[in-house]
From Swiss-Prot:
Taxonomy of the source species: Bacteria, Bacillati, Bacillota, Bacilli, Bacillales
Residues of the site described as Discriminates between blocked and unblocked aminoacyl-tRNA: N9
Name of protein: Peptidyl-tRNA hydrolase
Keyword list, A-Z: Cytoplasm, Hydrolase, RNA-binding, tRNA-binding
Subcellular localization, as worded in the UniProt entry: Cytoplasm
Function: Hydrolyzes ribosome-free peptidyl-tRNAs (with 1 or more amino acids incorporated), which drop off the ribosome during protein synthesis, or as a result of ribosome stalling. Catalyzes the release of premature peptidyl moieties from peptidyl-tRNA molecules trapped in stalled 50S ribosomal subunits, and thus maintains levels of free tRNAs and 50S ribosomes.
UniProt similarity note: Belongs to the PTH family.
Keyword Cell wall biogenesis/degradation appears in the UniProt entry: no
EC assignment: 3.1.1.29
Organism: Listeria monocytogenes serovar 1/2a (strain ATCC BAA-679 / EGD-e)
Length: 186
């Protein structure tokens, strides 16, 4: 069993923002597999998919970004999912829009959702997919990440969401290091 957490903020006003690209990836997986979202007792929405016989629990924390770990850790404990079977999907300002990077460990890199998860799981050594949203040319980062993708960037971000979902489906049957090597080369 795997736990796939897409990071974002709950609520309609955040739905299409850069900061919610993690939610968009797990929504894509739920859509592909036609599985419903249900409110969990761990302050998140969950959906279960089966890929190649492997159950994957998709989760969208409802804690708001900065407290994502408060949802992830209890789900790991409840389902008895080891850290190596967890993937966190989140937005990354340091990658161009539409690029993805898979990693098995690393710092939070200034991302508050990742800081919360690292604090709650007590390690930086877990799988992650960083989805590029680029940096603003000028202005505040907060307003930028809470803004929607402009029309010109939508084809690139849709492709990144698809590619991230493909990588997660591959992870159902393939060690993450191999998935990482495959998708980081593209």
């Amino acid at each position: 069993m795997k736990l796939i957490a897409g990071l974002g903020n709950p609520g309609k006003k955040y739905e299409r923002t850069r900061h919610n690209v993690g939610f968009m990836v797990v929504d894509e997986l739920s859509f592909r597999h036609q599985t419903p979202w249900k409110k969990s007792k761990f302050n998140g929405m969950t959906s279960e998919i089966i890929v190649g016989g492997e159950k994957m629990i998709l989760v969208k924390p409802l804690t708001f970004m900065n407290a994502s770990g408060e949802c992830i850790r209890p789900l790991m404990d409840y389902y008895n999912i080891p850290i190596e079977d967890v993937v966190i999907v989140y937005d990354d300002l340091d990658l161009p829009v539409g690029k993805i990077r898979l990693r098995q460990k690393g710092s939070a890199g200034g991302h508050n959702g990742m800081k919360s998860i690292i604090q709650h799981v007590k390690t930086q050594e877990f799988n992650r997919i960083r989805v590029g949203v680029s940096r603003p040319l000028k202005g505040e980062v907060i307003n930028y990440v809470l803004g929607d993708f402009p029309k010109a960037e939508q084809p690139d971000i849709i492709a990144a969401i698809q590619k991230s979902a493909d990588a997660i489906e591959d992870f159902a049957q393939t060690p993450f290091i191999e998935v990482m090597n495959k998708y980081n080369q593209k």
